[in-house]
Amino acid sequence: MKQKLQALDRAIKRFNDFPTPGILFYDITPIFLNSELFEFVLEQMAQFIQEVKADGIVCPEARGFIFGGALASKTKLPLVLVRKPHKLSGELARETYDLEYRQNSILEMRVDALENCKRCVIVDDLLATAGTVAAIDKLIARLGSQTVGYCFLIELQKLHGKAKLQPNVATKILLHY
């Protein structure tokens, strides 16, 4: 496991001042070019999803969709998409939140998306300030379901996002920076 995590770390490229000055961007796209590394990530996440007995996978766009779609197929669980405004049709629930480098962002989810998902795991590539996750938590609760797990490839520890997650909800993070 340690060797795989080291290989994951080596695969991730770092870019200073992207997308804005002062931000260190972790580019995970090289992982998708290596099927062995990507499969390792999916196996770790799928095992966690089974451990928390989730019955649905909730993920935000865009990179969350990459993991969420693959995990939904692997675990045979429904995939619930959380998107930016005006990307989903139907009746929507929306939540405002702040990002590390942008304020007053909005996420939307179809109000019928969780009808068969009462125990949700939130999957995304990165945990930074936890603004996105907190907004998704609120949407899940508002629609009558609960978050039973958080699953991320990377945590940016200096932003203290993990401290803002629900304290009694299991968390899986593969890499910590």
Swiss-Prot record:
One of its GO terms (biological process) is purine ribonucleoside salvage. It comes from Mycoplasma pneumoniae (strain ATCC 29342 / M129 / Subtype 1). The lineage of its organism: Bacteria, Bacillati, Mycoplasmatota, Mycoplasmoidales, Mycoplasmoidaceae. GO terms for cellular component: cytoplasm. Its EC number is 2.4.2.7. The keyword rRNA-binding does not apply. Homodimer. It comes from the Bacteria. It catalyses: AMP + diphosphate = 5-phospho-alpha-D-ribose 1-diphosphate + adenine. It is an enzyme of class 2 (transferase). Catalyzes a salvage reaction resulting in the formation of AMP, that is energically less costly than de novo synthesis. Belongs to the purine/pyrimidine phosphoribosyltransferase family. Pathway: Purine metabolism; AMP biosynthesis via salvage pathway; AMP from adenine: step 1/1. Gene3D superfamilies: 3.40.50.2020. Keywords: Cytoplasm, Glycosyltransferase, Purine salvage, Transferase. Pfam families: Pribosyltran. One of its GO terms (molecular function) is adenine phosphoribosyltransferase activity. It is found in: Cytoplasm. This is Adenine phosphoribosyltransferase.
